A protein has these predicted regions:
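N-terminal loops that bind phosphate or other acidic moieties
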Residues: 1-138, 142-383
Length: 383
């Protein structure tokens, strides 16, 4: 009987990690019904982070709340309460920016006035509950506000030269003359999950690299926001060159200023959901994501899990929506591309669950063939 750990990331825009894991297991079981499956859907701090913890941690409880979304419209969401542990005797709150201030919550891009107020409101709710620790995923952001909305919801004030609060979002950054942190709520232990290493400002900064995704189109607009983020860094007394400070439109920097610690998303999630223990007696692990390409390197879920599998002596396998020509798949014993199985990317996107099941079946067959081949080779060796 084969023991398979299922640990895909989300297939962004199509299938959540939890659903992907189920579909892969169903496909494998169609070939090997007696196989044993351990579900550990993964995330790297972006979309699906809360769902990964909810699926992996027994006793996790959803805590519903309504927050001001990135456009100021109320959004019904939740944060996740994890049971008490030795390190967190009053429990851990898991919150992701994607479900409170994420770009998927917008009807249209709002580069100047989208902000992170909702994230701050969710953090405040978890603090009110009394948690010992916060785990915050900050992928999929909608704004480049430098985390000012989040900090404002936690009690900070960002003022112009006349002492009046500045406008929300990136629009207000250029007008910030002073920051009042006297009302800022104290931070518990805060771990910030991100796979981004970009600094806050400069050519690799939040505005230059990620601003266009959020609607900042012109060079002049990017320069204005970049200057505003630099000024914010001065007022918060943080180094704008800090790795990861540019994550989520500068929210990474704001969380560090609040007292948080940035951590590689995939590694932190894997540790907190007990993935190493799950792999200790596993034969194989299947991971995956929507697009496995030349950028799917260190820090991304599939590459991280391939290394973890090697350490545990398990076979690493990959199922991806597509696998590009520049992708390095040498860490995986077997690879299944949904696009190749479906015949086109359009067909794969139209029925992702169907083709994930097909990928699971393909991987089961190739694993069985490899095992049979190894047995044959072993039987032929002189005793």
């Amino acid at each position: 009987m084969t023991r398979v750990v299922l640990a895909p990331d989300s297939f962004k825009g199509t299938v959540a990690a939890v659903e992907a894991a189920v579909a892969l297991a169903e496909g494998w079981a169609s070939v090997e019904p007696e196989a044993e499956f351990v579900h550990r859907p993964m995330a790297d701090g972006g979309e699906g982070t809360v769902a990964a913890f909810e699926a992996a941690v027994p006793g996790a409880v959803r805590m519903p709340l309504a927050v001001d979304g990135p456009a100021g419209v109320r959004v019904d969401t939740f944060w996740l309460l994890l049971p008490p542990t030795v390190d967190a005797p009053d429990g851990t709150g898991v919150i992701d920016l994607a479900s409170t201030s994420g770009i998927e919550l917008l009807q249209e891009l709002r580069p100047w006035d989208a902000d992170t107020t909702g994230l701050g409101q969710a953090l405040a709710a978890a603090i009110d509950h009394g948690v010992s620790r916060l785990v915050v995923g900050i992928g999929s952001s909608a704004s480049t506000d430098g985390g000012t909305g989040m900090l404002s919801a936690l009690g900070a004030r960002f003022l112009d030269a006349t002492g009046v609060p500045v406008a929300r979002g990136a629009r207000g950054l250029a007008d910030i003359a002073s920051v009042d942190l006297t009302g800022l709520r104290a931070a518990p232990d805060v771990r910030v999950l991100t796979d981004v290493t970009n600094p806050l400002t400069g050519p690799r900064g939040a505005a230059a690299v990620f601003g266009p995704q959020k609607g900042l189109r012109s060079v002049d607009d990017i320069a204005i926001v970049d200057d505003g983020l630099g000024r914010l860094a001065e007022l918060l007394a943080i180094d704008p060159a800090g790795p990861g400070y540019g994550a989520a439109g500068g929210t990474g920097a704001a969380l560090v200023a609040w007292g948080g610690e940035l951590a590689p998303g995939a590694a932190e999630v894997a540790e907190l959901i007990g993935l190493a223990d799950a792999l200790s007696d596993a034969d194989a692990i299947i991971t995956g994501e929507g697009s496995y390409d030349g950028q799917s390197g260190d820090g991304k879920v599939p590459s991280f899990l391939a290394n973890l599998a090697a350490e545990a002596g398990a076979v690493a396998m990959l199922a991806a929506g597509r696998v590009t020509a520049d992708a390095d798949t040498s860490s995986f014993a077997d690879v299944a591309s949904l696009t190749a199985l479906a015949g086109s990317s359009e067909a794969a996107l139209a029925e992702p669950v169907r083709w994930l099941r097909a990928a699971g079946a393909v991987l089961a067959r190739t694993a069985a063939a490899r095992t049979a081949s190894a047995r044959t080779a072993s039987a032929g060796e002189p005793s």
